[in-house]
């Protein structure tokens, strides 16, 4: 049986150990937490790494990666194919595949030739021969069936109607293209390019005269020297002098024409005025006398 003094001593020692063990455990936990946090890869990547990559040659420095990517993307944008070119390339590729399928001619499977290489062991040589033989057997088994006796179907020629339609279509497209080119040329001729800072001081001068301008010399209106001499003062030829008999005949003809005109006028006036009573003339004379 244990003594009471010994029991008290044991209990005191155990209490002292418990009190002193608590701070040591906390320190150990803190140290383990720091080690775990340092061992995490995310925190390592977050740490800034200072890298000093100096150029090998100061005169020849490389272009930055981002700038190279931008330049490459710009070059690709410039080299982009239009829809027409893409369609054309697709048609050419499709046509080639059709021709290849129509021909149906595939190359024969090459028979391997075996030869032991330098430094190759017998086991490796036999293994290589086995692999190549298995590969040839696989190709021959999975090859498409051939029919060498069957001839290829002849090409269908285009009908005359279809050829004429395509020809008309091409001509129409050519005419449209030419019309667009003419319109574009006219627009360029009508367009006047004005430079920056150009000042206009006067309207443009027309060097070409219109067709119906009065300033131009017409064929019948040219000022010739002979015309000036004829139409100038004293330049015209004098009229021939008429004889006295000729003058008398002309005077008589003129007098006869005047008398005939007067008689015709008088007759016309009498026809226009209505018939009057006989007393009216007497009354008119009386009134005239008064």
From Swiss-Prot:
Biased composition annotated in UniProt, kind: Basic residues: 164-178
Top-level taxon of origin: Eukaryota
Subcellular location: Chromosome
InterPro entries from the UniProt entry: CCDC137 (IPR026680)
Lyase listed as a keyword: no
Sorted UniProt keywords: Chromosome, Coiled coil
Protein name: Coiled-coil domain-containing protein 137
Species of origin: Mus musculus
């Amino acid at each position: 049986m244990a003594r009471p003094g010994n029991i008290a001593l044991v209990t005191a020692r155990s209490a002292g150990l418990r009190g002193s063990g608590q701070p040591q455990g906390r320190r150990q936990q803190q140290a383990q937490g720091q080690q775990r946090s340092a061992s995490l890869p995310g925190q390592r990547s977050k740490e800034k790494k200072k890298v000093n990559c100096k150029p090998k040659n100061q005169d020849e420095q490389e272009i930055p990666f981002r700038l190279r990517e931008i330049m490459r993307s710009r070059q690709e944008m410039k080299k982009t194919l239009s829809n027409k070119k893409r369609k054309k390339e697709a048609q050419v590729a499709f046509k080639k595949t059709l021709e290849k399928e129509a021909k149906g001619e595939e190359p024969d499977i090459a028979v391997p030739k075996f030869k032991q290489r330098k430094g190759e062991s017998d086991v490796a040589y036999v293994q290589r021969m086995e692999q190549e033989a298995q590969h040839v057997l696989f190709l021959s088994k999975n090859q498409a069936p051939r029919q060498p006796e069957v001839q290829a179907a002849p090409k269908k020629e285009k009908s005359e109607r279809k050829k004429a339609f395509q020809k008309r279509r091409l001509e129409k497209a050519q005419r449209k293209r030419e019309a667009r080119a003419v319109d574009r040329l006219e627009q360029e001729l009508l367009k006047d390019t004005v430079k920056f800072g150009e000042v206009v001081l006067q309207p443009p001068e027309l060097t070409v005269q219109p067709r119906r301008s009065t300033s131009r010399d017409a064929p019948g209106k040219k000022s010739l020297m002979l015309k000036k001499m004829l139409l100038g003062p004293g330049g015209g030829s004098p009229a021939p002098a008429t004889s006295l008999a000729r003058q008398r005949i002309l005077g008589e003809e003129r007098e006869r024409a005047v008398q005939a005109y007067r008689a015709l006028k008088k007759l016309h006036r009498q026809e226009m005025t209505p018939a009057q009573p006989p007393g009216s003339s007497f009354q008119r004379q009386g009134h005239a006398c008064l």
